């Protein structure tokens, strides 16, 4: 074994390791499964100045290395989340013609219902194996679902809660980047954010490599993913390995989108991820997911303010969004 495999530096010292045992520790670390970092959001949401600063730095480190983080202590209403999943199952169980009554033409899928097989990942010819419903800002005309009224009511409440939390997390992002804490706040209030209620139907006969959601990066600033109903999400790390993100009802997964990556000149990473079909009996079960995509107002400039400015073009958020919607078949 080459010496590079044994060089763990100060990390092993902090773990109480003796330099003579570094090679043994290196072998142990190599065998441990990779995982997305888990942070306690309560340190920022309820902590003192020192705790908030430390959390902001930890968040920056995670976003720079992985582009993803898992949070506990986020304060979201677990009962509301469970009720939203239950009403989503009722909505997606409706006949197609009833669901199509909630589709709104000409809005690029930004709100309302989008049917199965319409969206695909960038540069992917095959459609994703999913259907979804978007909740948007209340000033848009949101279609009511008369057959499942609790779906509309619960979705709108969860949207508001996730938007408020996302704005707080962007304050931590700003602090970690040495920007004023409220740098993003006014630019995301009333923005084009959406709560996507996703249904991946059973696919027992789909090809082994068929994507529930093909490899892609998110368009927006940050995404908040409420614990999914089943595993399947995988994140591509810097070593080229796919890391599974385990579904946990009490955890929130947060990731960097392309807009934030562009704004930071690549300092924060928008990481490729996908949703894969399970093996065996899992293919015969539905999977539900609740990602919240935090978008700014369309006028927000995404010109890079740090990092590799030459590699990241100057856009407004609106121009960037419209460009990407065309790439994935929603415009």
Labelled PLM ranges:
Residues 7-13, 26, 30:
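Acidic, Ala/Val/Gly-enriched low-complexity intrinsically disordered segments
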Residues 3-4:
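Serine residues within intrinsically disordered or low-complexity segments
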